[in-house]
């Protein structure tokens, strides 16, 4: 399956290609985290000594001292050629939902656990990052999902997700009822704890834990994974990313529900609402060191067996 990604209109100073050099670099990280702060300080000093203009996201700027230039996340997207996110995949997801609106490249320094989206080691990032800054890098484009909640034909709320959009009952797990339509074609009705709609990026996250397949990042596809369905015959299904997925919530559900985007943003859902999930026009531009191997990442993070011969 091919992938046909639409890239947001380039902003001044942030159109990345292999012949360009980086001039302005943004630093983003998890606030009030000792390890992250140490790495951000090293990065800021190291980049500044090499003559780069460095902007620091306002939530962590105060931890680096008064000499840093503090900006918000939108300004990093508008002004920077490259954004470096220090933290785990959760920090990367939060930044990515905003930065995907722009053409800025994004690379991660892993200060979390698995770190599927964060390539650089925190204690020895200099060698790999030097090569990236010299032009030895690859850009991988990851599409996002857009989730919309409609009530009585009116759009009530929406947001984007890098990993997944999840319909679920909220803080206490219980069985809910809903119908699933693909491009206005009825697929099935479901009694379950919810359903996960995941991108290839998210297929190694919540979707994987719920029994979904891993989708390689170049696939133009999404996977629907029921959560504890009350049937033995319902299984995850992969559909084209161009599909419009509609979830119709039964009016007989007794309590309010939620659609969670990457586990960070929560959209309120009432009985009878319709949720539309579709591919977003926004695209995350992940920057990897040259020679990046997705299967090496899977093998390392998931403990797969190494080559025998």
Curated annotation (Swiss-Prot):
Gene Ontology terms for molecular function: ATP binding; metal ion binding; NAD binding; NAD+ kinase activity
Keyword Membrane: no
Catalytic function, reaction form: NAD(+) + ATP = ADP + NADP(+) + H(+)
UniProt cross-references to SUPFAM superfamilies, sorted A to Z: NAD kinase/diacylglycerol kinase-like (SSF111331)
Enzyme class: transferase
E.C. number(s) listed in UniProt: 2.7.1.23
Top-level taxon of the source organism: Bacteria
Location of the active site: 89
Keywords from the UniProt entry: ATP-binding, Cytoplasm, Kinase, NAD, NADP, Nucleotide-binding, Transferase
GO cellular component: cytoplasm
GO biological process: NAD metabolic process; NADP biosynthetic process
Keyword NAD: yes
Cofactor(s) this protein requires: a divalent metal cation
Subcellular location: Cytoplasm
Amino-acid positions noted as binding NAD(+) in the UniProt annotation, renumbered to this chain: 89-90, 163-164, 191, 193, 204-209
Family: Belongs to the NAD kinase family.
Function recorded in the entry: Involved in the regulation of the intracellular balance of NAD and NADP, and is a key enzyme in the biosynthesis of NADP. Catalyzes specifically the phosphorylation on 2'-hydroxyl of the adenosine moiety of NAD to yield NADP.
Stored HAMAP family: NAD_kinase
Name used for this protein in its record: NAD kinase
Species classification: Bacteria, Pseudomonadati, Pseudomonadota, Gammaproteobacteria, Alteromonadales
């Amino acid at each position: 399956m091919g992938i046909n990604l639409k890239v947001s209109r380039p902003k001044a100073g942030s159109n990345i290609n292999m012949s360009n050099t980086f001039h302005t670099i943004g630093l983003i990280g998890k606030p009030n985290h000792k390890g992250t702060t140490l790495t951000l300080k090293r990065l800021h000093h190291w980049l500044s000594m090499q003559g780069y203009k460095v902007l620091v996201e306002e939530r962590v700027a105060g931890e680096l001292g008064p000499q840093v230039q503090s900006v918000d996340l939108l300004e990093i997207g508008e002004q920077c050629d490259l954004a470096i996110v220090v933290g785990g995949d959760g920090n990367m997801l939060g930044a990515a939902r905003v930065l995907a609106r722009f053409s800025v490249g994004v690379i991660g320094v892993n200060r979390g656990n698995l770190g599927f989206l964060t390539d650089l080691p925190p204690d020895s990032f200099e060698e790999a990052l030097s090569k990236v800054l010299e032009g030895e890098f690859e850009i991988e484009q990851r599409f996002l999902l857009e989730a919309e909640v409609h009530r009585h034909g009116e759009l009530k709320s929406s947001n984007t997700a890098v990993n997944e959009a999840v319909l679920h009952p909220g803080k206490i797990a219980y069985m809910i009822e809903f119908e699933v339509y693909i491009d206005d074609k009825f697929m099935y009705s479901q009694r379950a704890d919810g359903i996960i709609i995941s991108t290839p990026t998210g297929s190694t996250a919540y979707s994987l834990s719920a029994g979904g397949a891993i989708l390689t990042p170049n696939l133009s596809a999404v996977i629907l994974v029921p959560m504890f369905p009350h049937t033995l015959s319902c299984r995850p299904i992969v559909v084209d990313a161009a599909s419009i997925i509609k979830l119709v919530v039964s009016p007989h559900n007794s309590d309010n529900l939620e659609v969670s985007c990457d586990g960070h943003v929560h959209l309120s859902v009432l009985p009878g609402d319709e949720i539309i999930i579709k591919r977003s026009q926004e695209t995350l531009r992940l920057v990897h060191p040259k020679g990046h191997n997705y299967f090496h990442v899977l093998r390392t993070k998931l403990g797969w067996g190494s080559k025998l011969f």
